[in-house]
């Protein structure tokens, strides 16, 4: 099959049907269509409203703490001996990751729509914490669905959500991880349509979510562009970010998609190795199919049953990828690499020791591919890596990997 041709303007996507080429769309039951149409119309109106955008910008500045710094990682750069490495410090946001950018946008939209109850799904717990945080700020009840396996491995975040007033509902069905949490949240939404807003955390799901989450996260790329021009007087040679559903990555990538000189790299979770079948690399180890309302690359068996994803990182442990990433892969605009659990843990240790920054295990997957990427762009090159979250939540996981008791 021939690869689809590259578009003249990446900003023109998705189309009116919510599609990025063959991907995306609205594969949802009839009962959900009125909700999806209502949400799409409300978002389009908010997007075009300067008052909404000004209110969001105000909260991002004074509550979230934006702009986040673009930091030159001098010792890491020296260690690899190649291109200059800059880190976009999303882990310095309020709540410790990029997730709050999207939550703030969506909570303002929910209020605008008159919704009085918020539900969300979470994997690593970062989106759950960010959702619980904005719900506390605006005085709205919050229910967070979380796979029972993730509840176990992310106890600090579960406690943080409880402290913020959210109810965390463990999900035991399926693999008891993010996919199953999303299934339960969708069931809740259909049942409680009149008052409930479903605040999806990733650039996945049915249209308009992939577009909406991307738009709220694109502040990352817009700031990066401004900051790198100020620091270096030119655009970077490459961007790199970890990809599960892919919201942090698309937030960094999107404002640069029309700049053909900028190479784009996403890094999927290879778990124990793509060849072992125990991984979460939807593009490198999956094929197109439909899940959670959209067409995208998925981990599935020969008859199309969704297979369990595996990653040491709860935030990347999802059997699919956002539809815009699937399309960027097919048209050749972005390259999707992989990093194993072991490589990510090694990168976690390296950044901690060289720069005094504990990265989230999710972000560590992107860090693991820096040797190849810095080599590819050369000694005079510039690489920007999105440090999507902080690693405080992962110290227990890292300790057990190192055979240490905390």
Swiss-Prot record:
EC number: 4.2.1.20
Pathway: Amino-acid biosynthesis; L-tryptophan biosynthesis; L-tryptophan from chorismate: step 5/5
Domain of life: Bacteria
One Pfam family here: PALP
Calcium among keywords: no
NCBIfam families with a match to the protein in the record: trpB (TIGR00263)
Gene3D superfamilies membership: 3.40.50.1100
Gene: trpB
Residues bearing PTM N6-(pyridoxal phosphate)lysine: 99
InterPro entries: Trp_synth_b_CS (IPR006653), Trp_synth_beta (IPR006654), Trp_synth_beta/beta-like (IPR023026), TrpB-like_PALP (IPR001926), TrpB-like_PALP_sf (IPR036052)
Assembly with partners or alone: Tetramer of two alpha and two beta chains.
Enzyme class label: lyase
Reaction it catalyzes: (1S,2R)-1-C-(indol-3-yl)glycerol 3-phosphate + L-serine = D-glyceraldehyde 3-phosphate + L-tryptophan + H2O
Source taxonomy: Bacteria, Pseudomonadati, Pseudomonadota, Alphaproteobacteria, Caulobacterales
Gene Ontology MF term list: tryptophan synthase activity
Protein name according to UniProt: Tryptophan synthase beta chain
Record-stated family: Belongs to the TrpB family.
Cross-referenced CDD domains: Trp-synth_B
GO cellular component: cytoplasm
Native organism: Phenylobacterium zucineum (strain HLK1)
Keyword line: Amino-acid biosynthesis, Aromatic amino acid biosynthesis, Lyase, Pyridoxal phosphate, Tryptophan biosynthesis
Named cofactor requirement(s): pyridoxal 5'-phosphate
Cited function: The beta subunit is responsible for the synthesis of L-tryptophan from indole and L-serine.
Keyword flag Amino-acid biosynthesis: yes
